């Protein structure tokens, strides 16, 4: 702010993400009077990258109330195109873009995922054209199994079979160190049903 006050000139900011603070620094600069911020889609650039365009746009819009005139629902489409062209995949845990932003593995709160997503997620999935998703793995509970069976149209089972399915889901999640695909889950359900 003092540079702006001292010079009276418009201030621009260009940050790198060396300490994971590129976006935070640019948001702070905007609140201090910067009128132009530099960023790159998916945060890509040399070294550790620049401030991520998508994180900056969401921060300006949601945290500071700026109307950026951008189609936020197009962010994933742009990100996927950039990832494909650059041959640099989007990390699962990347803010705004990562697949992990709108998934829930643990059984607690799965009703919120679909009915009140802001209880579970930092932003509403629909803002970027996404939906919340329940996935299954080592942290899943009975409610997750029942929910996923309904989602996939697999019918209803008694508590004993649900417990067996849950045990298999947890064991598979631990073994593969990841969440299960729908196909893996359907195979487990079929196996338990066959008895």
Residue ranges of each PLM-predicted region?
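Active-site-adjacent beta->alpha loops and helix N-cap segments on the catalytic face
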Residues: 1-4, 47-55
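Hydrophobic faces of well-ordered beta-strands that scaffold small-molecule active sites
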Residues: 11-15, 37-39
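Glycine-rich phosphate-binding active-site loops on the catalytic face of alpha/beta enzymes
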Residues: 32-49
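Catalytic cores of alpha/beta
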Residues: 19-32
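Conserved, mostly hydrophobic/aromatic
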Residues: 33, 56, 149
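A mid-to-C-terminal "edge-of-domain" accessory segment
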Residues: 64-195
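Alpha-helix-loop-beta-strand connector modules within alpha/beta enzyme cores
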Residues: 1-13, 58-59, 63-64
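Acidic, glycine-rich active-site loops and adjacent beta-strand->loop/helix elements
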Residues: 17-21, 43-46, 82
């Amino acid at each position: 702010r003092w540079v702006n006050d001292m010079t009276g000139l418009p201030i621009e900011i260009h940050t790198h993400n060396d300490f994971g603070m590129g976006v935070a620094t640019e948001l702070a600069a905007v609140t201090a009077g910067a009128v132009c911020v530099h960023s790159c889609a998916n945060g890509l650039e040399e070294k550790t990258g620049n401030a991520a365009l998508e994180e900056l746009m969401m921060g300006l819009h949601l945290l500071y109330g700026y109307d950026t005139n951008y189609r936020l629902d197009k962010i994933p489409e742009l990100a996927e195109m950039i990832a494909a062209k650059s041959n640099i995949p989007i990390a699962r845990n990347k803010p705004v873009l990562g697949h992990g932003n709108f998934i829930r593995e643990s059984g607690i709160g799965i009703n919120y995922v679909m009915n009140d997503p802001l209880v579970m997620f930092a932003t509403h999935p629909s803002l970027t054209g996404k939906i919340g998703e329940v996935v299954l793995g080592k942290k899943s509970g009975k409610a997750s199994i029942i929910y996923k069976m309904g989602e996939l149209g697999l019918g209803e089972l008694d508590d004993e079979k649900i417990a067996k399915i849950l045990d298999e889901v947890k064991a598979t999640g631990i073994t593969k160190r990841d969440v299960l695909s729908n196909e893996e889950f359907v195979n487990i359900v079929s196996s338990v049903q066959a008895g």
